[in-house]
Amino acid sequence: MKNEDVGEGLVPSRYPKRKTARLKDFDYAQANTVFFITLCSLGKRQVFVRHDFNIEVVGCIKKERERVNHAVYVFCLMPEHIHLLSSPIGSGIPITRFMGGLSSQITRLSWRYGHSGRLLQRSFYDHVIRKDEDLRRIAE
């Protein structure tokens, strides 16, 4: 059996396939599409409770926003998760890459504060804001 055959057809996969939380045919790099994003800590631990750590997390959000040319309209740090309203700005860089970079930065930052291993869940929750939804209501 060749490696490329594993997980296809009648050959069972060695590992279970994870279901993706993303829409199959949606362009996550589409400019000016606004996403409501929730990024959770692993095990719902309350990791966003230290003021000094949170100040640096805000710096990570700003740094990643500039690095990949995404807008971050508003964000809210809660004890065990972060909410963001964000969108690509004509960069062609998908929201998944923005969130991957942000997650990496926050995790590395947390190591300086005594955390070890993974800090955040593997993925994030997103909701595409449709034109008929009230962006102001969601932001509040």
Features from the language model and the residues they span:
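Short catalytic/metal-binding and nucleic-acid-binding patches
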Residues: 1-140
